[in-house]
């Protein structure tokens, strides 16, 4: 049995809430700025090319190349699927990837791997699963406003965790895509998870309860980690 990835997100219900809240906001600011500099990715999704596949094979080997081919086929075959069908396929695709920590994979405390790096090493931590599912669903035509990458507290493990939430409509109860579960369940049925923050490419929310969040900011004020965008674009062989 493995431990959750325990991203550097504190539990805001702790007695040290002021310190932990500041730490949580710093973590989210870093991650959000990383993702937001790749803003076109949120709008257009992942790009596949022969150059990308060749790079994957050189960097990670032929098996990794084939995994990216399978991801491309997954995206391209999704046109006729309902959104629940897309969720099921994407959740199953990435949940078969092995779990490991950032320290073990990248020798770093916090490393935000691209979907291609995830498939390259065939391993991920919880942030990587959630982000990879997010990008893939965007590629399939799911609107960004329906998706939120969500930091939660896992009560079973007493650790921080990350999942992807899908909102069928603005006021609907979200569905939770979790690397620890094959089932996609309504948030109200996940009593083992306490949401803390959620975000997408545009906004940031503070959790009010398991089903609702209060918007606490937008993303255009964030301006760090341009390297993530450059890395992702380079991997996809997209001209800057």
Segments from the language model and where they lie:
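N-terminal secretory signal peptides that target proteins for export/translocation
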Residues: 1-17
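A structural boundary/capping signal
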Residues: 2-4, 39-240
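Structural motif marking the loop-to-transmembrane transition
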Residues: 16-24, 83
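Bacterial N-terminal signal peptides
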Residues: 23-36
């Amino acid at each position: 049995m493995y431990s959750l990835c325990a991203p550097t997100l504190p539990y805001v219900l702790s007695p040290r809430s002021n310190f932990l809240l500041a730490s949580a906001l710093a973590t989210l600011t870093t991650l959000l700025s990383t993702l937001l500099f790749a803003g076109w990715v949120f709008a257009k999704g992942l790009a596949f090319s022969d150059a990308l596949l060749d790079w994957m094979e050189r960097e990670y080997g032929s098996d990794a190349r084939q995994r990216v081919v399978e991801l491309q086929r997954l995206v391209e075959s999704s046109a006729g699927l309902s959104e629940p069908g897309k969720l099921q396929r994407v959740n199953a695709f990435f949940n078969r990837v092995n779990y490991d920590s950032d320290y073990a994979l990248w020798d770093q405390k916090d490393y935000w791997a691209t979907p291609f790096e995830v498939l390259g090493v065939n391993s991920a931590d919880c942030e990587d699963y959630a982000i990879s599912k997010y990008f893939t669903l965007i590629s399939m035509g799911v609107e960004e406003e329906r998706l939120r990458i969500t930091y939660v507290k896992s009560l079973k493990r007493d650790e921080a965790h990350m999942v992807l939430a899908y909102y069928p409509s603005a006021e609907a109860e979200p569905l939770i895509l979790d690397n620890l579960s094959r089932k996609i369940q309504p948030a109200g049925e996940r009593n083992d998870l306490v949401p803390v923050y959620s975000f997408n490419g545009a906004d940031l929310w503070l959790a009010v309860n398991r089903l609702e969040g209060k918007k606490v900011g937008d993303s255009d004020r964030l301006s760090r980690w341009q390297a993530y965008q450059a890395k992702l674009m380079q991997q996809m062989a997209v001209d800057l």
